[in-house]
């Protein structure tokens, strides 16, 4: 837990694990209030088994978004339905869903498959009298793509992105990834820096170490991770290319080197250093290693995060007596306090649209994830789990992934930005902590 004593300190081969979910998402709250949608199993037009049912991926994505609730397949009036031309609108007239996703898959060549999918506005179809003048009246989107057998899951995420954006106006985040640290104290090298698809599939290990690894942070282009490693018996900040495995040591000063986070242009890191005594916020140029001190106070300053415009940092400080979140303008150095409610507020990050801040709030001794509207300063506690920490916002600003404790074990969990939808991501072995959600990829 990021208590006052710990948050100032905590801040090789490319191993690919088979395409299964290492982090199984367990939805705990919020599905019943979601928007109903029908996802019809994609029609297979081949003589051998289909490599994977794309509709399964789409259904899981839409459910995990917290926004949609796919209908049970047994409740669909048509299950062998691949296009609008085959749709019996009368059979669908009383179906309580706002849209229908359907498609076909057929062999196209050696390890090639032609996928067609359509998104139908069912509400409009049900309200229309006299039948459509053209298919485009009901057809919200239609795509045709050739993929390989290894791309079925990825293309399912792509379809989910399209459906989500068409129906909500918000870009989908189903093709994103998460980084996190797994700790297995039974292993000789217990610390592993991992990345995986947002839903836990395609888990990959970037680094394994006998010493602690912590605080992973994505670059804006999604190609690099910054993190803290104690592999050399002291805290050091590294930046690693996740594709080439090339690593760059950015800081290795005596004392604390912690909590790195990339600037919006990807050229700098904001981080915490104690090289001059007290932990302070610095900005380091990744290419030149030049550093610039940002804060100068006798209290602890740590956990910096950039505003989307790159002109300010928010950070945690105890300069008011207890940990609270402040904002510092990089040009002037002016510091403004942002949080006042609760006993502690720490670990803040700004939503991509710049309107909200997500952070850890302690009230009555309980650590939970909270969100604050930066214009009205209204604060909402989003979670009811225990010992919550390390919130990270999805790039579309709709969900937050964070660390928590469940049945005595550190796990990851997710909550929607309105607090309505909640899910848990337990892992099979070891503990999982320090999640970081990637940008759009």
From Swiss-Prot:
GO cellular component labels: periplasmic space
Sorted UniProt keywords = Cell cycle, Cell division, Periplasm, Signal
Q: Which residues cross the membrane?
A: none
GO biological process entries: cell division; protein import
Is Cell division a UniProt keyword of this protein? Answer: yes
Supply the InterPro entries for this chain.
Answer: 6-blade_b-propeller_TolB-like, PD40, Tol-Pal_TolB, TolB_N
State the Gene3D superfamilies in the record. Answer: TolB, C-terminal domain, TolB, N-terminal domain
The signal peptide, as residue positions, is 1-21
Locations listed in the record: Periplasm
Q: What is its main location?
A: periplasm
Assembly information from the UniProt record: The Tol-Pal system is composed of five core proteins: the inner membrane proteins TolA, TolQ and TolR, the periplasmic protein TolB and the outer membrane protein Pal. They form a network linking the inner and outer membranes and the peptidoglycan layer.
Q: What does this protein do?
A: Part of the Tol-Pal system, which plays a role in outer membrane invagination during cell division and is important for maintaining outer membrane integrity.
Provide the family line: Belongs to the TolB family.
Q: What is this protein called?
A: Tol-Pal system protein TolB
> What species is this protein from?
Shewanella loihica (strain ATCC BAA-1088 / PV-4)
Question: What is this protein's gene name?
Answer: tolB
